């Protein structure tokens, strides 16, 4: 392959004439995926969520992919191919899209694997888009796909904070509700309202909706019972995708555990710490414009996050979460902050944050063979326990061929001690 002879293994591209195409996206998580098509519509694209990840996704992903890759990639590929195989879409008017961060792990190779999988399944004619939010990630750039970041920034930020806050209230209420289904009813209702507001591009209305949601979740009649608190951390996809995590969260709730999951916003905000650390350590150069803009952008995001937290504090089971720089401070006691592959130092920071709040039972999940997260998760177990002796850490590798009974047995050891 040379500049004169570019790679032509997958010929379909998304050009300017293709903006009319329906863009299929894999299901990620219940509190954010429903809002993504609305954000995309504001940006001028028609995104459609695939159905929630299922056993069919895993089987199809393995059939057309490679079982040596990251398990989430197998599920993502399976989601996309399964939906294309339904026959609901004109292949001349459809494309697929996935997100890319450009990190130092197998996830960076999703694109190549998904293109090969689509080709194996007979969908080589379907263009593949990589959705990124900048940061120097240049993968699979397509002339017809450009996100108007400034147009959707305000509403996008509020949608993410809203989803995080809604999920926190949902997680606290569903394990305590007296009338089964009431919590889910409110969760679905407010996600639907959030979709409507997102389409209107009214960021301030999401704050008002948050206040209303807090009042309604507080009105749920609860059962007064003793619950164990269990923290759930790990790789972003298996942490937030119900099938990807083998429904661990549901299993724990069924065994009288309140599952505490860190907000997804932390995953994105850690880049502000990373930029600073990389500059200080001479790992990456930062131009003067970026140096000036980064603190302003963080200040904007932090101020917006605090507005949502102020409203969330009024919920009955509010669980505070520290700022990303405070988490970095905690993590620095455990490992060098230059460890940024996989979830990076964020895992150490989240474990420390839970431990300082008295949550000592923690499940850390990652895809089987995820070397990046093994290093920054299980690799720091001894040091974590030196700092926090009361910790009870359980590390679980998730894979399509794992026996769920073995996983449940290990979870019993965590909660039955």
Which residue stretches match the model-derived regions?
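An N-terminal assembly and electron-transfer interface module characteristic of large anaerobic redox
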Residues: 1-417
